[in-house]
Amino acid sequence: MRKKMQTGMHKGQEKVMDGKLRNMAGLYLQQGDRMLLLYRIGSKVVSDSYTASAGGHFEKEELNDARACILRELYEETGLTEHDIVNLTLRYVTVRLKNGELRQNYYFFADLKDGQKEIVSNEGNLEWFHIEKLLKNPPEMPFTAQYVIKHYAEIGKNTDMLYAGIATGTGVAFTEMEEF
């Protein structure tokens, strides 16, 4: 049983009640059975681990437009534009309580068009991974990202659903999102 603070809240909840949010978006680029990951270096939030091909925090004017955020991040970090990719789709939205803030991550997937030049990033080192290798021997990744990749490889890549994930201390619980 979790200990409750004197206020009746669980540890960490007192800051969440202030409404602090961190909205982030990530894009996983694919080509065939390979996925491009970024070994991010020098980030204030996620550093020295593998992350999406491109991603970051929402700008004020993007708060209601995750697609605009990810296209901006894609261009800023790799020089690629929407014309260099196909099938850009929001597939996962995750929520995690971390350091007193709710971290909402919007995970997009897209295919890189054939014939693209070598991709470089100003945020770290890009590396292609076979999706099966990611499952068998995953590199160091942010908490929700590792569960998104696992779910995508096992289930998500075979559907066209949007999934919501709630992070717990032991994993991420995913459910299909439906419009109603």
Each model region followed by its residue ranges:
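Short loop segments at secondary-structure junctions
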Residues: 31-34, 41, 111-116, 131-133
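Charged phosphate-binding loop/patch that engages nucleotide di/tri-phosphates or the phosphate backbone
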Residues: 151-180
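N-terminal strand-loop-strand
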Residues: 2-53, 82-83
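Conserved Nudix-box catalytic region and its N-terminal flanking loop in Nudix hydrolases
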Residues: 34-75, 172-180
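Conserved hydrophobic/aromatic beta-strand scaffold that supports enzyme active sites
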Residues: 28, 37, 107-109, 128
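NUDIX/MutT-family hydrolases
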Residues: 54, 107, 118-153, 175-178
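Active-site segment of metal-dependent pyrophosphate-handling enzymes
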Residues: 66, 79-116
